[in-house]
Amino acid sequence: MSLLKDSTVAVITGTSSNLGFNIAVRLLEGLPDNKEITLVVTSRTLPKVKEVISDIKKYIVAKIPTKVNKVEFDYLLVDFTDMVSILSAYYELNKRYKHIDYLFINAAQGVYGGIDWTGAVLEVLQSPIEAVTNPTYKLQKVGVESGDKLGLVFQANVFGPYYFIHRIKHLLENGGKIVWVSSLMSSPKYLSFNDLQLLRSPASYEGSKRLVDLMHFGTYNKLEREHGIKQYLVHPGIFTSFSFFQYLNVFTYYGMLFLFYLARFLGSPYHNISGYIAANAPVAAALGQTKQNCKTASACTRSGKEYLLEEEIDSTGSDDVVSYLDTLTKEWDEKLKDQIVNTRQP
């Protein structure tokens, strides 16, 4: 249990990412100064946890000094491609907390193999704005399974977090809020209902975000009706993410940034570029400033002034997706029923 009495508890998955860090600091800024907050940082590795906690502490001192004595830090080591790791995280939270106020599902994983540079050049020449809004030149590996014999991207981005929520639902009951971070690129075209684990998909990351959209629309009403939990769906727009930097050199990185700013100048509302602006929708949702029956996007004007966009989603197939996830959940409940884990091992 938190050392801070009656503290507000927030769990942010993928906190060490650009978006995760900015969700954390914006949430701290958005909560009242008299609120004591326990921020549960998550990552797959202990060094990343230590680094992001240090970065958030520095931000608090520099930008929100009124929160210096109001924030307590905790951490979870969790890998959503490992069901035993998810079970371990559940045990830790269940031991330490009686209630969780905010859960941000921000952790995301792709199985990228690089960039089709010929395709990238052609896309940029033919339609530069589309090339940096809905790119098709990012190469993704096909058929990658996790150690649990599930589609790796499906497990990391959809089923792993879904199962995690299933396990900790009692901690979120009666007022807890869940914020799922989806993507601008989650069109129905990326998902085949004959391949829900995305093992045959050449766009498994985008397909996983389509699954997140459908899962939300198939569950948010029931969560609120039966458990008093409010669930929201958001996307951060387009911003500089650390995950793809390994495929860029200094020239291609600044070329990408130039095209981002050009797209924004030409009227794209989604090229936020800044991780801080990208975190607007996730935090606004957590603070009750968005609707549950739509997808809310972080957006900005040409000058970088942030605002929110509401997007309607085609929810056809949401019941089928939830049924599939629930069947898998029951299977893994059975597989893990005798599992005992040592939970704080880095």
UniProtKB/Swiss-Prot annotation:
Induction statement: Expression is increased by itraconazole (which targets the lanosterol demethylase CYP51/ERG11) and by zaragozic acid A (which targets the squalene synthase ERG9).
Keyword Oxidoreductase: yes
Transmembrane segments: 242-262
One GO term (biological process): ergosterol biosynthetic process
Carbohydrate-modified residues: N272
Annotated knockout phenotype: Leads to complete loss of both 3-keto reductase and oxidosqualene cyclase (performed by ERG7) activities, compromising all sterol synthesis.
Family classification: Belongs to the short-chain dehydrogenases/reductases (SDR) family. ERG27 subfamily.
Protein name per the record: 3-keto-steroid reductase ERG27
Protein's gene: ERG27
